[in-house]
Each structure stands twice: as structure tokens, then as C-alpha cells.
Amino acid sequence: MANRTVKEAKNVHGTNPQYLIEKIIRSRIYDSKYWKEQCFALTAELLVDKAMELRFVGGVYGGNIKPTQFLCLTLKMLQIQPEKDIVVEFIKNEEFKYVRALGAFYLRLTGAALDCYKYLEPLYIDNRKLRRQNRAGQFEIVYMDEYIDELLRNDRVCDIILPRIQKRSILEENNEIEPKVSVLDEDLDDELPSDEEKADETNRPKENSTAVRRPRRVRSKSRSRSRERERRSGQGNSARSRDYYDELEDYDRQRNRVRNRDTHNEDYDRRQNNGRHDRERERQDRDSIRERERDGDRDRRDRERERERDRGRHDQRERDSRGERDRRRY
């Protein structure tokens, strides 16, 4: 009874919401200790408190397929089917990043393509780190924007097969969604000169050609800005899309540089820790070898003493038996 979907729940993608998770994983969740103890009789209000306690994301791990707490709460949300406003508040929550990750994962499972692009794409500006548990049970670092990109592009996330959604380009061609605008557009608008500044430059009296001559680099920069203005004003959605992808490449390169620096620092710390662990392990090995040698010497001494006692008892019995024979003879 506790594992049934609520009566007022609606079908999602033509099926029971809980069936969006494969049966084998669903059965493992029902049998898990966290589901039985922490997810029993949860409501939408109480589920918020449980989501705030999350410390990592992930699917299943281990040889016997153990579900993570993140996956248990996802199934609970599919079971009680909270209102869309609650899910949107999960996604807009900036204080608890794992609450946002849980809401984004649930919306990707149950939401339409338009809702997924509408509510998940703004999260590309979130560069916070998330801990994710892999199938081996080990933790790895993933960034929030990378996690959101996986939800929108990959077929499987956190060991769950995601429903298919329409590509963004198709929705743009059908005018169902506005072309994506990069967050860098505002910076580009600030760098471009306004019409008034352009008019002032035009009306300014000409001076000596050698004095007003600017470097070639500056002219090319102004010329590129002019071409950019003309392209932005004269072209349609396709041009804006191309601009966005160019800016996205620049953003990815900058993000990769930051990540490479973080990875280098983490590798350095890991090498330092490994060196300390190796020295500690060598010291423990030396101590264990000395302990085994002391134990071996102690055992040898005990065996020698035992043999001496046995030899003494044997000699005593021989003397006693010889004396007894002598008494019988006389």
C-alpha cells in the first residue's frame, strides 16, 4: 500500500509516474532501509526537509545495486506527484544546491520539452560543484551547469533512462520557443558604442591624418563591432543562434581553464596525501615485520623450554624405572 502512487496522480508520458524508473531499480528502492525509515508517509512539505539533507547526487552503486538517497527521494516525488509550483521552487532555490538538482532531475523526468528548456537552461550560469556517487560507490566532482547539460542532452543520467524530448532547434523552427540568448549579450551591448556616440564621432572635425590615425588593431576591432551590430540588427534567429554558439564556445574554454586549475590543485593535494599515506603504510609494515620477528623469537624460546622440560621428564622416568628394576633384583 505504501508503494502505490497516489490516487489523484496523473499519468506522465502515458504511464504511471513510478514506471519511469526501471523495475529492478524500483524494487531495490522499495527494499532499501532509507526508503522504509525516512520516506514512509512523506508529503510534499516534509519532502522539502529531506531534500535539504541531501549531500550528493547519484543513481545506484555496488554489486547488489544499492540506491542512493537522491534516487529514493526522486521515486517519492514520482509517487506523490507534487504540484508544478513546488517543483519550480525547488529549481529556483539558490541556497541548497542539491534541492535544485533534485527538482531539475524530476522536471526532466516528468516535464514537457518546453518546460525543460524554460526552467533548466537558466541554470547554465550556476557553476557550483556537486558531489556525485558513481557505480563503484566512489565520489566524483561534477559542476551544476555540466549536470544540467547532461539532463538536456544525454539519454541516461543517474542510471535512469530519461524520456525523449524534442531538440531545441526544432522548437525554434516551429516558433514554439525563442532563440537562446547568451548571458554574455549584455556585456557585448555595453562594449558596443551607442548611436549618439557614433554621431559625435562623425561630426567631430578631422585633424591631421597622421594624428588621428589609429593602430590597425583598433580599426579592426571597431570594424568587427560594426559588423557585429549589422549582423545583430539585420539577421534573424539563425544569426543569433550562431552568435550564441560562438559565445558558448568561449564560455566553455574559460570554464575548462578554471576546471583544469582546480584539477591541478586537487592532483597536487592528492599526491601530497598519497605520499603521507605511503610513508604511514611503510612505517606500519616495518612495525608489523618487527612484531612478527619478536613473535617468532618468543615462539622459538617457548618451544626450546618445552623440549627441555620434556627431556627432563623423560630422564627422570628412566632413572625411576632403573631404580625399580634394581630393587626387584635384590
From Swiss-Prot:
<feature type="compositionally biased region" description="Basic and acidic residues">
    <location>
        <begin position="240"/>
        <end position="330"/>
    </location>
</feature>
<dbReference type="GO" id="GO:0000398">
    <property type="term" value="P:mRNA splicing, via spliceosome"/>
</dbReference>
<dbReference type="GO" id="GO:0071013">
    <property type="term" value="C:catalytic step 2 spliceosome"/>
</dbReference>
<dbReference type="GO" id="GO:0071011">
    <property type="term" value="C:precatalytic spliceosome"/>
</dbReference>
<keyword id="KW-0539">Nucleus</keyword>
<feature type="compositionally biased region" description="Basic residues">
    <location>
        <begin position="213"/>
        <end position="224"/>
    </location>
</feature>
<dbReference type="Pfam" id="PF03371">
    <property type="entry name" value="PRP38"/>
</dbReference>
<feature type="compositionally biased region" description="Acidic residues">
    <location>
        <begin position="184"/>
        <end position="199"/>
    </location>
</feature>
<comment type="similarity">
    <text>Belongs to the PRP38 family.</text>
</comment>
<dbReference type="InterPro" id="IPR005037">
    <property type="entry name" value="PRP38"/>
</dbReference>
<feature type="region of interest" description="Disordered">
    <location>
        <begin position="182"/>
        <end position="330"/>
    </location>
</feature>
<dbReference type="Pfam" id="PF12871">
    <property type="entry name" value="PRP38_assoc"/>
</dbReference>
<keyword id="KW-0507">mRNA processing</keyword>
<protein>
    <recommendedName>
        <fullName>Pre-mRNA-splicing factor 38</fullName>
    </recommendedName>
</protein>
<comment type="function">
    <text>Required for pre-mRNA splicing.</text>
</comment>
<dbReference type="GO" id="GO:0032991">
    <property type="term" value="C:protein-containing complex"/>
</dbReference>
<keyword id="KW-0747">Spliceosome</keyword>
<dbReference type="GO" id="GO:0010389">
    <property type="term" value="P:regulation of G2/M transition of mitotic cell cycle"/>
</dbReference>
<keyword id="KW-0508">mRNA splicing</keyword>
<comment type="subunit">
    <text>Component of the spliceosome C complex. Interacts with Mfap1 (via C-terminus).</text>
</comment>
<dbReference type="InterPro" id="IPR024767">
    <property type="entry name" value="PRP38_C"/>
</dbReference>
